[in-house]
Structure formats: C-alpha cells, structure tokens
Amino acid sequence: MKKSEIFASVLADVSAETEIDSDRILSSERKEEVVDARYLVIFLLLGNGFYPAMIAERMGLSARAVRSAISGFEARLANSAGLRLVCQRLAAKWMA
C-alpha cells in the first residue's frame, strides 16, 4: 500500500471509530476528543513507517507539534479509558 493510501485509511478508520469527522481531526480544534483522535492518527502512522516530518506535512502540522504529540501520547492514553479502547482496536488492525 502506498503512503498516501495508508494515511487516508488510517484517518478514515480513526474517524469511523471515534465518530469524529476527519476534517475536525485535521483541524486545529482543541476539544479533548478531537485532540485524542489526532494523537491516535499520529501514533498509528508512526507505527506504519511514517517519519514525523511526513506526518506533519500530511496533517498540516509543524514537525514540532507532531513530536510533541508522539511524546505526549502515552500520558493521554494513561488518562483516557476511551482512547485506550479505541487504540487497542485500531492497533490490532494497523500494527499487526
């Protein structure tokens, strides 16, 4: 699968699983559930061989924002049972 196809599929899967529109995930919206979904997309893309700069380019973020999301993902995961459940389901598909 091409990188562009992986990106689109991961984004669509996270959007479907979280019931948050992909446009909102890619926006600068700061609501907790949207930020969690954005971080999850970044985590899954990283696990599929994307570099932070590649993720940043595709998501319209700075590389620094992506690195911050990567370093803060475990803390968000530890504090959100809902995010953990969604992450487990999607990681089984995308990280296998």
Question: Could you tell me what each predicted segment is?
Answer:
Residues 54-58:
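Short alpha-helical "recognition helix" segments of helix-turn-helix
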Residues 16-38:
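Short, Lys/Arg-enriched anionic-surface-contact patches
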Residues 34-50:
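Short, amphipathic alpha-helical "recognition" segments used to contact nucleic acids or chromatin
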Residues 12, 53:
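Residues within the helices of the helix-turn-helix
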Residues 65-67:
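Helix-turn-helix DNA-binding helix
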Residues 46, 70, 74-77:
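DNA major-groove recognition helix of helix-turn-helix
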Residues 76-96:
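Short Lys/Arg-enriched helix C-cap and helix-to-coil transition segments
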